[in-house]
Amino acid sequence: MEEQRKERTIDELAAENDALRKKADELNKEIEYLQQQVNFLKKSVFGSKSEKKVLHDTENAEQLSLFNEAETEARREEAEEVSVPAHKRKKKRSRAEILKDLPVEEVVHEVEDKTCDRCGSEMKQVGKEFVHDELVYVPAKLFIRKHFVEVVKCVSCGKNESRDAELDDIEKEHFRKATAPAMLIPRSFCSPELLAHIIYSKYNNAMPLYRIEQDMKDHGVMLSRTTMANWIIKIAEEKAKPVYELMKAELLSGRIIHADETVVQVLHEQGRSAKTQSRMWVYCTPACSGKYLVLYDYCQTRGGYNAVSFLGNYSGYVVCDGYDGYNRLTQAKRCGCFAHVRRKLVEALPSDKELWATSAAAEGVRRCDRLFALEREFDGKDKDGKQVREPLSPEEKHRRRNEEVRPLLDDFFNWLMTVNPAGGSKLAKAVQYALNEKRYLYGFLADPGIEISNNRAENAVRPFVVGRKNWLFSDSPKGAEASAMLYSLVVSAKMNGLNAEEYLVRLFRSDVPMLPY
């Protein structure tokens, strides 16, 4: 009896011990999850907004090098870093590089006394010697351009008595007037240059209309923001919309489209609260198209039917994020974004960098970086995204993707199945996101023109997001629609290397639509 009691007690203690261990494991996972949340919030509030995370250890193969490959975005050229014993400094751009695209005005300072101090003869110029450059700023100026039409009179009419006998004195004299260009905005003093500057200031420089109003006042003109808003809406309908429709037709004629969307607040939407968030959808052409066409589309909701409304029966490839609304595009072939996968893995990295060597999140980032490194190699770019050699031909790129990239993708998803993160953790969400998107993340292998990420569309969203931080909201749906069309023109012109303000002036003076490239 005593032995049985002891055995039962041992069994009960073992069961209790197992239960406590299980509970401890659950609590540890909960602590890990909560710590991840705290670290993420700290990073969001106090940390760097960049995803550049570098950990180098060339002597230890287990250490990782978490490069910035996935988030390179055809970004601006960065200054070369030069190592100095005590610190690092950025190599300065040369003066010639800074000033190379500006017009030049030469000033020759003449010798005041051109009498030879040796013999008294006159001295003549034989050359000029360069002294220095200076960068000159000419403040903007406003002036009135008064339009007149010439009136001409025939010098012969009225003097031929036999021919003009039946005409009265007024009809005998023949006059003609020149044709004046139509006013850009009827019954206004708006010029192409003025309106182009207002639109450029708002949509390229992110200046809200109240600041433009103040700027005009500083130049001596009382131009209200209401007047400017009305001008913008009218010109968008009359001049921007025809160009927008041509851009849309060209976008839809291509085999690949990048898509994304972001929030916008519109105050006076019928039947909706002013606090309700609307959406600005963004569509753009791929890099392989040779043109950068960006189209913004204002919609009241995020529903996937908005993408269907814009793209219609488009049957090409659509590169996008993991939003399920894109599944409504039943004719199109959806492709995923590895930058989103990598970003979620970066968010799951331990705050202690010493743990990166054994972190599953870091291993995931490293695997993503291998994919991005190969893509850059195929495109002839270095690790900073700069073009350093000729890219592979489409045929060669397609072949090497299937030979070299596809096995890495297979390994990546097989590895994901072995990761067992704490439920609800950042890592769990990152793993689940990648697995949910698996079908679409293989999509870029189908066509060499499809990019591995949707960074192109995210870059196209950025100008709108920057502007939104300043002007905060649109007053009406008409204003939001006008903004969508004008953002499309301004951003596309800029992406294609044009001076957007000069492009707008030419467009406003033209009788036919002019594409921004």
Which residues are covered by each model-predicted region?
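Catalytic center-proximal scaffold of phosphoryl-transfer enzymes
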Residues: 1-6, 113, 151-153, 159-517
